[in-house]
Amino acid sequence: MARRVLGQGHPGALPLWEHFVLNELHARLQTRDVRYWRDKQGHEVDFVLARRGRHPVAIECTWSVDAFEPAGMRSFRGRYPEGESFVVAPDAVPASTRTVGGVRVRFVDLETLVRALGKR
């Protein structure tokens, strides 16, 4: 949606995409267990699904799979090694899994992310 409205290169497009993903997670998963993570060095993960008794799920939003920068995810997984790591991007079709920067990451579109998280 944000990609259509503002265009990929627009400076406000990525925050709009992140907000859209957050709204979809809240609405479709019916949860408020979505958090944000940032360390003192400035590494961050857009969203962390922190459900009681389960390993944290890390979610990064990006416009394309090629634009993913693994520093935040790597720092998060260094501290919390258990759990899945997702990158949600409009062009992540078909979904794929690969290791980037030493972290195993699943690249998915938004619909695939919601379906995968809904099964947990």
Region spans (language model):
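A cross-kingdom feature that marks ATP-driven nucleic-acid transaction machinery
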Residues: 1-120
